[in-house]
Amino acid sequence: MAKIRQKTKRAVAKRFSITKNGKLKRKHAYRSHLALGRSTKAKRHLRKDAIMSTSDTKRYTQCL
């Protein structure tokens, strides 16, 4: 008989991806709309993916 396992939280699975080293990759916020006041440089930096902190990674990997 199979053991009970925790189901994947789909909201977390859609927002984060796991890198080869086990870190969580995420997108930056504040890019969808109302970005006219932000400079081009600031918007360009938000384009790149970010790596989550190690303390948050432990919490979110349980959901995946």
UniProtKB/Swiss-Prot annotation:
It comes from Ureaplasma parvum serovar 3 (strain ATCC 700970). InterPro entries: Ribosomal_bL35 (IPR001706), Ribosomal_bL35-like (IPR021137), Ribosomal_bL35_CS (IPR018265), Ribosomal_bL35_sf (IPR037229). Belongs to the bacterial ribosomal protein bL35 family. Keywords: Ribonucleoprotein, Ribosomal protein. One of its GO terms (biological process) is translation. The keyword Transmembrane helix does not apply. Transmembrane segments: none annotated. Pfam families: Ribosomal_L35p. One of its GO terms (molecular function) is structural constituent of ribosome. HAMAP family: Ribosomal_bL35. GO terms for cellular component: cytosolic large ribosomal subunit. This is Large ribosomal subunit protein bL35. The gene is rpmI. The keyword Transmembrane helix does not apply.
